[in-house]
Amino acid sequence: MTQWIIWLAIETEAAKPEGGLFDFDATLPVMMVQLLVLMLILNAVFYKPLIKILDERKEYIQSNFNEAEKCLAQAAELTTQYETKITDARQNASKLTNTTRSEIQRFVSEKLEEAQKKADSELASATNKLELQKDEALKSLESEVQTLSTKILEKLLGIQIANT
């Protein structure tokens, strides 16, 4: 059977007239109709669904792109808000630090002043006590010096001196 198919193919090749791409005869309009029918079938079966899928994909990409732009704008806005809040927080922290520092300095200076006053008053009190003790010691020593000098004179002179 394969021999018959090969022989038939050879005979049809030999029966063809030699010429160009196709012959201008009654088969030309049939080929045009076949081409149009093929184009209509391909259009209905292949191209329209393909174009529909491509359009849907384009819309999907565009919607995702628009959503991404919205998210990007929202992220930029949130970043701006965040930076503003951070700046405000830093300023507030700086003010609080400065206020606290000045309060601590004031507190320390008050405590130092109180301690200085207390030390001065204790020093003055101690000085007064020492002065009083010195005066008392001098008075007691003065009377003792008087008594001792009288005794020394009595022993040296051998006379009794009356205490005045």
Curated annotation (Swiss-Prot):
CDD domains reported in the protein's UniProt record: ATP-synt_Fo_b
Segments traversing the membrane: 26-46
Molecular-function annotations in GO: proton-transporting ATP synthase activity, rotational mechanism; proton-transporting ATPase activity, rotational mechanism
Keyword Transmembrane carried by entry: yes
One Gene Ontology CC term in the entry: plasma membrane
Membrane topology (UniProt): Single-pass membrane protein
Keywords recorded for this protein, A-Z: ATP synthesis, CF(0), Cyanelle, Hydrogen ion transport, Ion transport, Membrane, Plastid, Thylakoid, Transmembrane, Transmembrane helix, Transport
Cell location: Plastid, Cyanelle thylakoid membrane
Keyword set includes Plastid: yes
InterPro entries linked to this entry: ATP_synth_b, ATP_synth_b/b'su_bac/chlpt, ATP_synthase_B_chain
Pfam families: ATP-synt_B
Superkingdom, taxonomy of origin: Eukaryota
Family: Belongs to the ATPase B chain family.
Subunit structure: F-type ATPases have 2 components, F(1) - the catalytic core - and F(0) - the membrane proton channel. F(1) has five subunits: alpha(3), beta(3), gamma(1), delta(1), epsilon(1). F(0) has four main subunits: a(1), b(1), b'(1) and c(10-14). The alpha and beta chains form an alternating ring which encloses part of the gamma chain. F(1) is attached to F(0) by a central stalk formed by the gamma and epsilon chains, while a peripheral stalk is formed by the delta, b and b' chains.
The protein's role, per its UniProt record: F(1)F(0) ATP synthase produces ATP from ADP in the presence of a proton or sodium gradient. F-type ATPases consist of two structural domains, F(1) containing the extramembraneous catalytic core and F(0) containing the membrane proton channel, linked together by a central stalk and a peripheral stalk. During catalysis, ATP synthesis in the catalytic domain of F(1) is coupled via a rotary mechanism of the central stalk subunits to proton translocation.
UniProt protein name: ATP synthase B' chain, cyanelle
